[in-house]
């Protein structure tokens, strides 16, 4: 339960009921984060539109998108988002030790070598952008290129990092708790 009023699924009507149906089709259930949006169904639909697009469009693999989601969400202490996206990583057959390490402490997971190669560079960039956005430099983008990422992939890493920081802050700011 969030700190603001929420409409439960059984009481949803109209636009909100449609949004909940979309979420149910995609996730199998309406998670607490989306129930917090119930006070503004129009914003919920807009958010779902954007989320669906960034999930389907682009060139990054689903695995890399979910690695970013877990690392950023865990770094921000957003338990609801961390749990949801850790589940998606497991569904993509990412080793449980990697998922658990990232969900517990993404910085330590990188330092301990749970994630390596280009994915470590991606998550290092994502964590720096999450922690200290004002400290980002051209060298941070160059490190992504040096790891083999294309310009569209570099853009997508920045976009996804910013997106998950946004969602984490909405959830944390409204007191969303995992089920």
Cite the ranges covered by each PLM segment.
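Hydrophobic alpha-helical segments
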Residues: 1-179
